Amino acid sequence: MCPRHPEPVPLAHPLPVLKEALEKVDQILRQAMSAPGVAAMSAVVIHNDTVLWTGNFGKKNGSDPASGAPNEYTMYRISSISKIFPVLMLYRLWEEGIVASLDDPLERYASTFTINNPLGLASAEQQGLILRRMASQLSGLPRRLRSTSLLWKGSTQEALNLLKDDVLVVDPGTRCHYSTLAFSLLAHVLAAHTAQGDYQRWVSENVLEPLGMADTGFDLTPDVRARLAAGFYGSGRPAPLYDLGWYRPSGQMYSTAADLAKLAVALLGGGPRRLLRPDAAKTLLAPLLACPGAYFANETGTPWEFHAQRGYRVVRKDGDLDGYAATFSLVPPLRLGLVLLLAGPRPPGPDLVARAYDELLPALERALREAEPGPAPPPTAHPFAGYFTFANLTFYEVRAGPAGELRLRQFGPRVEALVPPAFRTLALRHLHGRVFQLHVAHEFPCALPLGDAWLSLEAQHGQLVNFYPLDHHGLSPGFDVPGLNTYRVLRLRGKPVFKT
């Protein structure tokens, strides 16, 4: 059925259908607290710029029987969710012109960078390792620098020196391969081209402070440690708080459910502050390449993993680090977001976030379809009402509906023989002036059989109808539907009569 995605119209909360879905999400997460090592959990669901629900479970410190429950301001390590921030830096520098193109080679910003690519064609080597691929899982770089752990304390120049004798494990842009190295290298290289000259300072001044994310950062100070939910391994043993050194951009950060909700709202285009222009934000949230079945996601993007679920692309960034697990996820067509933070390992079995979306997606879709407003009427229907024809092949009647809205009815012997009555009449939603928008229905078949062909209702839905300037009688002499390549649909003096 179409439209495949409902319009993300404002909703008047609370709605029973959403309340029921959120209660089921609460139950799913509450039951997951019985998994080994999971001590605390905080979650938040966002729609548009509104927090629909928060859930907090367990104890902030699972080792202390007297510990209180966490809340949306409890800090957790967010591990690979940190990778979102180097990508935001890349896109902002691109908007500001410091980065000329997302497809610039890394060498343009790190002149001493070189690495062997034994799997690539000679003609492709010159543009293989581009910034866009560095910001996704398409760089082909190894997971980490040779002979280093996540605790390595070296410099970016030392990293570049190590890469000279290393090899790409995948030809860039050809296959999804997870690399922590790529995001840390991207962050440190780009930071050298900013006024701050320091990655962490740039993130604080350009992302965290503007969004009011005061409880998000990098340094595990005594105050931060006191507010962190205590992390545990699956065995129940407390996990240490490692400092990731040079790899900090890829996994060092801590945050709260409340702060990550602010980031989700900004990326969905809501709230008072936007991080990126709409065109850049759309590029940021688009997939780059489908991943093979063995990979853990359907598609990769910058820096996202995309998972297909119930007809939607769920945009996700998951992170797992000793004692902690986290997921930041968005469904842009619905302007829906879900953040999940755990002190403890990710529970085994069916994915918690996917189970939550199994409840949220159909509920929100239903709520949006039911809340969709009727077609807006024009100030007066008179200039547009009447009979029209396209080359004496198809015939239309435009008339006012009960609420003053315009309706476009297609008629004639052939139409009446082939098209069901319910789909011969489309609403015309008034936009401004003489421009209207075709609206089939809240829900309809995407296509109908039409003799030996098919009539695409999906193609008609949402198309603009541009009526001509009014004549001296105050009537529009016709209209065009440019999106359907239909021009010169002209007014008739009266209702046509068809010979049988």
UniProtKB/Swiss-Prot annotation:
UniProt superkingdom: Eukaryota
UniProt xrefs under Gene3D superfamilies = DD-peptidase/beta-lactamase superfamily
Cystine bridges: none
One of this protein's Pfam families, by short name?
A: Beta-lactamase
Q: Which family does it belong to?
A: Belongs to the beta-lactamase family.
What protein is this chain from? Putative beta-lactamase-like 1
What organism is the protein native to?
A: Homo sapiens
Source lineage: Eukaryota, Metazoa, Chordata, Craniata, Vertebrata
Q: Which gene encodes it?
A: LACTBL1
